[in-house]
Amino acid sequence: MQSLDRVDLCESLLTWIQTFHVDAPCKTVEDLTSGVAMAMVLQKIDPVYFDENWLNRIKTDVGDNWRLKISNLKKILKGILDYNHEILGHQVNDFTLPDVILIGEHSDASELGRMLQLILGCAVKCEQKQEYIQAIMMMEESVQHVVMTAIQELMSKETPVSIGTDAYAELDRQLKKANEELNDALSAKEEIAQRCHELDMQVAGLQEEKSSLLAENQILMERMNQSDSLEDPNSPAGRRHLQLQTQLEQLQEETFRLEASKDDYRIRCEELEKEITEFRQQNEDLITLADEAQSLKDEMDVLRHSSDKVAKLESQVDSYKKKLEDLGDLRRQVKLLEEKNTMYMQNTVSLEEELRKANAARSQLETYKRQVVELQNRLSEESKKADKLEFEYKRLKEKIDSLQKEKDRLRSERDSLKETIEELRCVQAQEGQLTSAGLMPLGNQEPTDSLAAEIVTPEIKEKLIRLQHENKMLKINQEGSDNEKISLLQSLLDDANMRKNELETENRLVNQRLIEMQSQVEELQKSLQEQGAKTEDSLLLKKKLEEHLEKLHEANNELQKKRAIIEDLEPRYNNSSMKIEELQDALRKKEEDMKQMEERYKKYLEKAKSVIRTLDPKQNQGTGPEIQALKNQLQERDKMFVSLEKEFEKTKTQRDQEEKLIVSAWYNMGMTLHKKAAEDRLASTGSGQSFLARQRQATSSRRSYPGHVQPATASDVIA
């Protein structure tokens, strides 16, 4: 990259470094020259390696002190290189390292870009590299392109680091420790030199101030000689003289103290220089030891390689000795094997003749095996469909449970409505007595009084009582229909469960029969190989093969029938679930209609009560239209009740007929299928088999039938 590209790289990496959201400012180049933000970013990249101890070594309050900035940047650069070498196992060879002096003293953007490029390399190769790569992908396209080219440039200049022995690693650790101590001492030396420089500046300033004070003192002395004597403390010149004298003494004490501290810092600086020389000497000694350890390591590798060769040669010599000892035995065995070979040649000739005779039967056996494989695949498909039916059964059972809960809730609401209706009856009876007693003297005044009296007439009371009774009967009929529906659905589920268990047992019996037939086929193969030369045995084997093929065809037909039965059952399951959902929706709509009617009924009652309470001779003229509106609303509600009752009766009769038809069809189908399965089992276990085959099948069915049926029923009951 050119210098212009480096500046662009620095700007792009500045935007990337802001994605870490560190506490230190990191928006400009000057913010990053202190090194604090970069150190915090490194700690976020790997908090185990760049721990708190390492972070505490970075000075935060650097201000404009470029020496402290350079010290921080050196520590960060060393930490990045050590992290690449120790943790990532890479070493940057051809990459130009950043000049920390230019960064700290002049805020060079190109060198800062190199430093940020090294931090970028640590981020995309650490353990959380996916997170940082994703953050780069979310940035702008131009910034993303620059960052990707920087990563490619850095990776092209890295080489893997070879792992040394334990001694070399120990020397490496000691060398790093010494380098760290040396860097600490150098940083301390720089700090002390900076402090000495500051003290020198303070001494120079104090000396200038002292000279100015002396000049001022001299001027004052001359003035004092001209005007008043300085010995008189009451005169202003005497007081000024005393003040200047005390100030002079204080400044002298301050200069003495600063000179003493300056001497102390010089002594400390000399001690640190001595320590630096000692550390350098130790570093040189450790480097020589590291070179010696590397040479010893190479020698050890050579010796190890030669010792491996010696061990291999010794093992080869031992194996050759054993082979020579076994050679005589092998020669004797060769003679015996030649004799056996001649005998085996004669046997092979006879066996080849037998093999020619058995080839015809072998082709039939191969077709039989292929049919067995196809039957096994079909059986697995049937088991999958049975699992699907079991899942549908569980789902229907959950729906029944929810319907039961809804039924309980409706019962509780019915009880609460009963209580409210009884309370309303009591209130209406009391109000009827009050209104009949209060409206007697107003009977001959105006026609509006007669309308008010009609509100509480026995006709309205009878209508209210009749409506309450009808409401109660509708709720009772609704609960009865819910109970009948739940019982019918439960019976359907029980029948489906029984049929599913029967199909599972039949599938398991068919599987057992297939296994037995496969074992019989293997026995037939063995008998063909042993007795292929005998014609009578071959005829018997052919008959047995034909019998087994017939059994296989029968099993295949049974599986196809069961598959068709299961395919017929699946749409009926789906239709029943859809009907249940439709019934639930109708039930919800009816419940909402009932609630709306009850609310209207309560509103009408409250409005009638308010009219009766507010009724007096002065307001009789305005109550007529309201009472007429109430009567109209009561008539509309009666009509609505009648229409709802008719619709409810129609839907109830239609639903009962559909459920009865479904139950009868389901029961007839189950009986026919059960009868067919029993007839097939009786036909399959008939006289077509031999006595030994029937006995073997009877014992296997006695072993497998209880163990397969009982767990299925238990699991279904639990579900």
From Swiss-Prot:
Record field: transmembrane: none
Any one Gene Ontology BP term: cytoplasmic microtubule organization
Signal peptide stretch: none
Domain Calponin-homology (CH) stretches: 7-123
Compositionally skewed regions (Low complexity) per UniProt: 693-704
Keyword annotations from UniProtKB, A to Z: Coiled coil, Cytoplasm, Cytoskeleton, Golgi apparatus, Microtubule, Protein transport, Transport
GO annotation, cellular component aspect: centrosome; cytoplasm; Golgi apparatus; microtubule
Cellular location(s): Cytoplasm, Cytoskeleton; Golgi apparatus
Span list, region Disordered: 679-719
Coiled coil start-end: 162-431, 459-665
Keyword Protein transport: yes
Database matches in Gene3D superfamilies: Calponin-like domain
GO molecular function, one term: dynein light intermediate chain binding
Quaternary structure and interacting proteins, as annotated: Interacts with microtubules.
Protein family: Belongs to the hook family.
Function: Acts as an adapter protein linking the dynein motor complex to various cargos and converts dynein from a non-processive to a highly processive motor in the presence of dynactin. Facilitates the interaction between dynein and dynactin and activates dynein processivity (the ability to move along a microtubule for a long distance without falling off the track). Predominantly recruits 2 dyneins, which increases both the force and speed of the microtubule motor. Component of the FTS/Hook/FHIP complex (FHF complex).
Protein name per the record: Protein Hook homolog 3
